[in-house]
Swiss-Prot record:
Similarity section: Belongs to the universal ribosomal protein uS19 family.
Annotated GO CC locations: cytoplasm; small ribosomal subunit
Protein's UniProt name: Small ribosomal subunit protein uS19
Gene that this polypeptide is encoded by: rpsS
Gene Ontology MF terms in the entry: rRNA binding; structural constituent of ribosome
């Protein structure tokens, strides 16, 4: 279910503070580490790189215009697929 329009998009305060600090300093190369997968990507995030935690390590996510409105967690998968098991009877 989508978030109510009257509430508006959500972003953690600590993440927004880190973004504002990075934009003010002009440091677009640094990776902003975050555990906040639930935060919505805002237009002022464009051009920044986030290290989004997937439960094991931080995955670098470079934000582009097409990502605005999505959540950070959508771009850092948490599960790895290794394929189905091989049938040992067929040899």
């Amino acid at each position: 279910m989508a978030r109510s329009l009257k509430k508006g998009p959500f972003c953690d305060h600590h993440l927004m503070a880190k973004v504002e600090e990075a934009v003010a300093s002009g440091n677009n190369k640094a990776v902003i580490k975050t555990w906040s997968r639930r935060s919505t990507i805002f237009p002022n995030f464009i051009g920044l790189t986030f290290g989004v935690y997937n439960g094991k390590k931080h995955i670098p996510v470079h934000v582009t215009e097409q990502m605005v409105g999505h959540k950070l967690g959508e771009f850092a998968p948490t599960r790895t697929y290794h394929g189905h098991g091989v049938d040992k009877k067929k040899k």
